[in-house]
Amino acid sequence: MRCKCVRDIVDEANRILFTKHHATEDRSVEYFFRGESKNFLRQRDGMNLPLDTSFPCCLDRDDGYIDHERDFYQEALRLNIASFEKDQTMVERLGRMQHYQVPTRFCDATTNVLMAAMFACGGGRHGEYDEEHDGYIRVIKAKKERIKSFTSDIIVAIAHLPLVDRKNINPSKKDDGLDYLRYEITNNRPGFAMTASPEIKRKLCEEIQHVWAFKPVWNTERIREQSGIFLAFGCRDNKEPLHPTFSLQDFNNPDAPSYGIAQVEVIQIQSDCKSRIREELRYFGVSRELVYSDLSDVAQEITPRYTYNNK
């Protein structure tokens, strides 16, 4: 079914969550949503790779992004240091960078299906409304033990990966290189648990090769209004992407990168109905100017409403 209005979207969400998956009865998992204005594809050697149920974090949408992960972080910080003055941790910094669309290992989602619908209808920054492609709301479930605190060791470790060269991270090898990562982390967080015992270090080597969900600090208006939750993507040797499937088959496979996190279904939005749905969402208190409260974004959102030739 291709949704044509907000009611269609809510009906589909109700069917998926409560009729098919009995979400209110299963206390072992949580459900959330990710809205995409089109089907984002991975790029390898100039070719699009099939996604099936998988979806990449922004950093994995282009080969060059992975190669220059450290540059992205350093340049974003150098060019706009004032924006990060209130951030006390790397997790908070990367969350803010994700907000401003800097490619990171974080992938944002929401517990609010209407907010996901806004993003699926192209409600991003800078007036970028995509009316040519169908939108998608990915319905995702995660085991509660795979949802971490923003202060947990594994989330902190993944957040510090941009500071370490690719060649120095090899979690599957004896010379795993995690001492480089530990050095960067302890600069910001003395007493990081990786130093506690070889067993904890071994566990981190395993965990860093998975995707994890975590609930971030609400340090931006977007994250607060979005009811945001993040997926944090770890890495393989040489910081190669994980390519998680997010399939139901891998949901219970501890060796799978997406263990404990799966896409259960996709709600599809008809491309030529996006404008109507955005207008309907405004009556439910969901609009871009609430999520992106910068004056430039607010201006770009409200100006077309009062233009005579806007039809």
Please state what every model-predicted region is.
Residues 1-311:
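Catalytic-core elements of nucleic-acid end-processing and repair enzymes
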